[in-house]
Amino acid sequence: DLFQNYSADCLPLGDQDLITLKMGVAFRAFNSIDQVEGTLTANIWLRHWWRDGNLIWNPEDYNNITEMAVNTEPGGDSSIWVPDIYLYNTAEKPMEQLDYSRAHVYSDGYIIWSRPGIIKSTCTFNLRSFPYDTQHCPFKFGSWVYHDGQMNLTLDEGSIDVSNFQENDGWNMADFSSKLNFVKYTCCPELYPDITLNVTLERLPGYYTLNIITPAYATSSLMIISFLVPWDSGERISFAITVMLSLIVFLLILS
């Protein structure tokens, strides 16, 4: 009977003035880092914690049941209200590949909801120091509907979890940070909170050093050595031409 008069379309305030939503992200892996397209695809678990004032019960009245798993799919049977958190800087349809997993509801009304899935964000890559470059990619999350007078968006302690992160072959996650922002948009008079997660990526240059830089330097050095060959030797010109052709072929392969 908890869901008899329950509406998943209304803020479940109960005795609260506004919903306090804690957020966190567990990074599992970076599936794709596309520097040409300017996108970063990540496998994540998007975590939410809040209190639903309309889902509180006395366990003694329900066979000592203290928690239950409930549906979060919009329009589903016994579906509960869930926060509409979107990735603002998405590179595709917002949150399309995040699963509407079941949420854990406790008898005191507190809810834990973890959404596994794939997100694709935009990222501006600065390749001036390639291949010894460091990139900074943001993930900006926030509610699409609720402003700061309706939802108190907060950072969970340890909001970024990388304990189960699978390292990328070409990149290293060097650092990460999170920041809570309040932004006033031209459409609306209220402030809208968002949480921006900043990920710092360091390129692993070993492959490029071994396969590009070292051969290029070696070939260029041979060109200098050609000047040590006696000028009246017929092999000097043929040696220089051979080195030049080798360098051209190498550059064609790289392109």
Task: Go through each PLM region and give its residues.
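Non-transmembrane, solvent-exposed beta-strand/loop segments in proteins
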Residues: 1-241, 253-255
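Winged helix-turn-helix DNA-binding recognition segment
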Residues: 244
